[in-house]
Amino acid sequence: MSDILSELHQVLESRKGANPDSSYVASLYAKGLNKILEKVGEEAIETILAARDAEVSGEHQALISETADLWFHSLVMLAKLGEHPDKVLAELQRRFGLSGHDEKAARSGKH
């Protein structure tokens, strides 16, 4: 899985200097971080709605599609801020095997 994330990150990086008229990602970069954050929020809401619909209908394709959109726009956000998706994967790896309660307490400084 990390291979596709790294490949996508390379494409996102290459779009930073591209003409905004030639690429959707370049147009997002040109519009700035607030536009990218707006898209992340929009995709998060669409993912939530798709999950609710999937629970009722049993059909999960829209949920998968919306989750892909959310991940994509989150990767655009990370790239805009100079971060690589490997850092997110490393954080997930660090948390793996930890109790959710213990991990949350560690983040908030509560033990």
UniProtKB/Swiss-Prot annotation:
Biological pathway: Amino-acid biosynthesis; L-histidine biosynthesis; L-histidine from 5-phospho-alpha-D-ribose 1-diphosphate: step 2/9
Leader peptide range in chain numbering: none
Gene Ontology CC, one term: cytoplasm
Compartments it resides in: Cytoplasm
EC number: 3.6.1.31
Sequence similarity: Belongs to the PRA-PH family.
Swiss-Prot/TrEMBL GO biological process terms: L-histidine biosynthetic process
InterPro entries: HisE (IPR008179), PRib-ATP_PPHydrolase-like (IPR021130)
SUPFAM superfamilies: all-alpha NTP pyrophosphatases
A GO term for molecular function: ATP binding
CDD domains, per the entry: NTP-PPase_HisIE_like
The keyword Lipid metabolism is annotated on this UniProt entry: no
Protein known as: Phosphoribosyl-ATP pyrophosphatase
Gene3D superfamilies: MazG-like
Keywords on record: Amino-acid biosynthesis, ATP-binding, Cytoplasm, Histidine biosynthesis, Hydrolase, Nucleotide-binding
Cysteine disulfide partners in this protein: none
Catalytic activity annotation: 1-(5-phospho-beta-D-ribosyl)-ATP + H2O = 1-(5-phospho-beta-D-ribosyl)-5'-AMP + diphosphate + H(+)
